[in-house]
């Protein structure tokens, strides 16, 4: 039996990188990078079974080129994990239209482009699954991160809508909303700030990327789960 192929969009850092590392024993893994080519080449070198492709999710042409490369190499894509995203803190009244649009263009419009390019073939095969990384801020909102929160809420809404739309095509859509996770996005926090965050979490500590990967593996392997937003936050949003 041929191994299925997983495409991890935004797989050179953080949760995406941890996902790539965890999947190569069971799947062929393609992952994308944009501004972190050096990190991507290191991953490709150190993780047998992984293939790195450049992709700028802000460009439909780049996503279409990605599909061509994936199909030349693997013939098809069975699962897509969308980890691409950016975050920043800023008061709403200080946001420019450019700030707002760039956030949406990567976090949600990038997902739209990837699905626009890859989904039709999944529908023809009546097989596939998509997992997108959202955030707890997409559920409860975050002060000074309105543009980020809006983009992540959009991922949850899109996931639920497409899960209904393509259920009869045997394509599953799910998303994961992590809470505080040790990735680059927390790298600017001081030790005191990290301690304060941990104290607000019922389980008493900040999560690791592997905690999110566990959720991804569950969603990949359970064929009876669709339309779900899996919250992995140590109880933070209770």
Question: Model regions: which residues?
Answer:
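Substrate-binding pocket helix/loop in short-chain dehydrogenase/reductase
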Residues: 91-92, 99-104, 186, 193, ...
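Conserved glycine-rich Rossmann-like NAD(P)H-binding loop of the short-chain dehydrogenase/reductase
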Residues: 27-41
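Residue(s) in the substrate-gating loop at a strand-loop-helix junction
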Residues: 135
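Active-site helix of classical SDR
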Residues: 115, 151, 159
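Conserved glycine-rich cofactor-binding loop
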Residues: 12-13
């Amino acid at each position: 039996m041929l191994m299925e192929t997983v495409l991890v969009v935004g797989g050179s850092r953080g949760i995406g990188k941890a996902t790539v590392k965890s999947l190569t024993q069971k799947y062929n893994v393609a992952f994308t990078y944009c501004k972190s080519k050096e990190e991507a080449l290191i991953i490709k070198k150190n993780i047998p079974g992984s293939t790195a492709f450049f992709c700028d999710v802000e460009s439909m042409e780049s996503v279409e080129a990605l599909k061509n490369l994936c199909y030349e190499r693997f013939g098809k894509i069975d699962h897509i994990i969308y980890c691409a995203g950016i975050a920043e803190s800023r008061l709403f009244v200080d946001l420019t239209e450019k700030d707002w649009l760039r956030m949406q263009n990567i976090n949600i419009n990038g997902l739209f482009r990837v699905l626009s390019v890859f989904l039709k073939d999944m529908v023809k095969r009546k097989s596939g699954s998509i997992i997108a990384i959202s955030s707890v801020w997409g559920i409860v909102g975050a002060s000074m991160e309105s543009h980020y929160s809006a983009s992540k809420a959009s991922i949850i809404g899109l996931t639920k809508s497409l899960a209904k739309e393509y259920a009869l095509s045997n394509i599953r859509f799910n998303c994961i909303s992590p809470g505080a996770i040790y990735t680059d996005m927390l790298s600017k926090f001081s030790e005191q700030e990290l301690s304060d965050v941990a104290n607000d979490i019922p389980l008493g500590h900040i999560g690791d990327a592997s905690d999110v990967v566990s959720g991804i593996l569950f969603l990949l392997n359970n064929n009876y789960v669709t339309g779900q937003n899996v919250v992995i936050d140590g109880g933070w949003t209770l």
